[in-house]
């Protein structure tokens, strides 16, 4: 499914500038570039988008490339792992055939994680990984931070489309839906967040993001 004309107009005209230091599968290139157009801060960041069978409990995952963590932050690299298929109860669906808005929202959420990583030191990223593994409370807060980054950069409608797709899909397992409902922002939360951010100045929005990251660390520490 291709992007409609209005969506294409919203993509930065020079696609080549969005592709700098990026590796993107051709089949999802338009959706990835649309998501990247909302993150000018990542224009020079090395990010590799690739399909993998390694993901068992997620559709996508953003991870720093370990060997680059000893470099300066500007020289770090990240991977966004993508499951090639969307597993349903009785069938599978190629991920690139999911509705554009849904796929863009998924990618935008993972780019939100990279924005979070970019603000952390190497030790901070290691701590993030440990706490994410140990604490479900930390997972929820970390996912809220990623969604907040995306919403703050104008991706609210995409993030909402992704959440509604997951929670309303009749062929998705209830276990997966329960996990999403438990650990991630609900559609109502996203609508409320969009409304709040629209009322704030840019400086206030950035302060909200910083507060979200601090809350995630504080709550996780309290629960260890």
Feature roles, as predicted:
Residues 139-156:
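An active-site-proximal "capping" alpha-helix that borders the catalytic cofactor pocket
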Residues 22, 26, 97-98, 102, ...:
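Soluble non-cytosolic domains of exported or imported proteins
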Residues 97-115:
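Short alpha-helix carrying the canonical HExxH Zn2+-binding catalytic motif
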Residues 101, 116-144:
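Post-HEXXH active-site segment of zinc metalloproteases
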Residues 61-100, 117:
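Active-site scaffold of zinc-dependent metalloenzymes
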Residues 155-224:
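Long, well-structured alpha-helical subdomains associated
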Residues 112, 148-151, 164:
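A broadly conserved amphipathic alpha-helix scaffold signal in soluble, globular proteins
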Residues 1-75:
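A metal-dependent hydrolase signature that marks the N-terminal structural subdomain at the beginning
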């Amino acid at each position: 499914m291709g992007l409609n004309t209005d969506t294409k107009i919203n993509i930065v005209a020079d696609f080549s500038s969005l592709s700098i230091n990026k590796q993107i599968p051709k089949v999802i290139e338009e959706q990835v570039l649309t998501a990247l157009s909302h993150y000018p801060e990542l224009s020079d960041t090395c990010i590799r988008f690739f399909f993998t069978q390694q993901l068992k409990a997620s559709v996508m995952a953003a991870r720093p490339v370990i060997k680059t963590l000893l470099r300066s932050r500007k020289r770090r690299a990240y991977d966004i792992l993508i499951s090639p298929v969307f597993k349903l109860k009785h069938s599978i669906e190629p991920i690139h055939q999911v509705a554009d808005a849904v796929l863009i929202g998924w990618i935008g959420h993972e780019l939100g994680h990279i924005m979070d990583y970019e603000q952390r030191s190497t030790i901070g990223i290691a701590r993030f990984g440990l706490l994410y593994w140990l604490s479900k409370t930390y997972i929820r807060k970390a996912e809220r931070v990623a969604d907040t980054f995306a919403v703050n950069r104008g991706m609210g409608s995409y993030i909402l489309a992704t959440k509604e797709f997951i929670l309303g899909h009749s062929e998705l397992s209830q276990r997966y839906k329960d996990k999403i409902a438990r650990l991630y922002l609900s559609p109502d939360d996203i609508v409320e967040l969009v409304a709040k951010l629209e009322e704030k100045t840019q400086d206030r929005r950035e302060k909200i993001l910083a507060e979200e990251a601090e809350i995630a660390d504080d709550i996780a520490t309290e629960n260890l």
